[in-house]
Amino acid sequence: MLIDKMHLKFFRNHTDFDIDFGPGINVIWGKNGVGKTSILEAVYILSIGKSFKTNRVNEIINNRSKSLSVDGFFYDSENDLRISFQQFLGKSKIFKINGVKEVSKNIIGRFPVVLLSPEEEKTTKGQPSDRRKFFDKLFSLLSKDYLIKLIKYNSILKNRNNLLRLNSGYDVILPWDVQLSRY
């Protein structure tokens, strides 16, 4: 799918902003601090379901508002698709596809985006855990099955590690090890 246009409302320094994308390569340019990176961040949110810059909603919502919205309009040879994102301070994210509410995991992969920025240098030069995190994101975009298994794996690993911290016995940890071995 390709992005056709996008509307930002109270997203960082954009209070009410429309952008149309052309076919092929698009260049976003302007002075420092006008919101070029915010446009990329909004596209990323519509693709991945979260910001690449922060986990704190109050950093994304414009200080003149208590909410934000991003609407992206996408197309391919067969479909037109509208992905919407809303966030209110202190509330859960709301995603919609063509007006129907969706959980964020159903957004991932609809419109694949891979981010490579100077901050992502750790992907190539950083710790193995950083590379793993990058490729987990990439493969999750390409395969919903991978994403589902990754979520289950991380949940099992978290439970197992909690038991290890509590010095639980071998017989308590073994079932979690067995489950981990399936992934």
Range-by-range predicted roles:
Residues 1-45:
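Pre-Walker A-like glycine/lysine-rich segment at the N-terminus of P-loop NTPase domains
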Residues 23, 117, 138-139:
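Short, histidine-centered active-site or binding-site loop motifs used for metal coordination
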Residues 23, 34, 38, 55, ...:
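Generic alpha-helix structural propensity
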Residues 13-16, 20-21, 34, 44, ...:
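Phosphate-binding site recognition
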Residues 24, 42, 110-112, 134:
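ABC transporter nucleotide-binding domains
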Residues 47-130, 142, 146:
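Nucleotide-state sensing region of NTPase/ATPase domains
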Residues 122-183:
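An accessory alpha-helical subdomain
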